[in-house]
Regions:
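Short, well-ordered coil/turn elements that cap or connect secondary structure elements
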Residues: 45-47, 99-101, 120-121
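Short helix-loop-beta junction
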Residues: 37-51
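Long amphipathic N-terminal alpha/beta scaffold segment
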Residues: 1-36
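Cofactor-cradling patches in redox/metallo enzymes
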Residues: 58-117
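Cofactor-binding loop segments of dinucleotide-utilizing enzymes, especially the Rossmann-like FAD-
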Residues: 27, 55, 109
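Short, solvent-exposed amphipathic alpha-helical segments in soluble enzyme
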Residues: 38-42, 89-93, 122
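A structural preference for short, hydrophobic beta-strand core positions in alpha/beta folds
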Residues: 52-53, 106
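Peripheral docking tails and interdomain loops at the edges
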Residues: 105-152
Length: 152
């Protein structure tokens, strides 16, 4: 049913592309992709170019992370199964990213259930609903762009 209405949702009220790109990923091996899919529709409706990924393991996670230029990577973490691995891998992935200003946002059930386990360097924790997530992520990039333009 969600798939049937997806195209209608995306086209209804859609804004022009905003030029921002987003990789939305679940944790490796996750069975909980519906929430990420639904969130992606909110970002698309706001004009974002969204890539969805559901990696099968940590190697796939790394490949997806570094597969293209992204302004933002959003990680939806449903369990604590890979928290330590992801936390340890992020600095390497950020250092090797094509975009040196890449922003990483953390969300999903773990952001609400155990936010204290997700306070990692160079990441922003998202709690709340999809509309709030889109607003916070978009505003963060807008503020970064404004700071850069003021220094030029």
């Amino acid at each position: 049913m969600l798939h049937d209405y997806s195209a209608e949702f995306v086209t209804e009220g859609r804004l022009e592309p905003n030029g921002y790109s987003l990789l939305l990923m679940t944790e490796p091996g996750s069975q909980h992709g519906l929430g990420v899919f639904m969130l992606s529709e909110f970002f698309r409706r706001a004009g974002w170019n969204v890539t969805l990924a559901n990696p099968v393991d940590m190697n796939d996670f790394k490949r997806n992370f570094q597969s293209d230029w992204f302004d933002v990577v959003g990680l939806s973490l449903a369990t604590d199964r890979h928290l330590i691995e992801i936390q340890q891998t992020l600095p390497e992935l950020l250092a090797g990213s094509v975009n040196s200003a890449l922003r990483v946002f953390l969300g999903g059930p773990m952001a609400s259930l155990a936010p204290d386990t997700m306070t990692w360097p160079r990441t922003v924790l998202l709690k709340g609903n999809a509309i709030e997530a889109v607003e916070k992520v978009t505003q963060t990039l807008f503020n970064m762009e404004r700071q850069i333009s003021q220094t030029l």
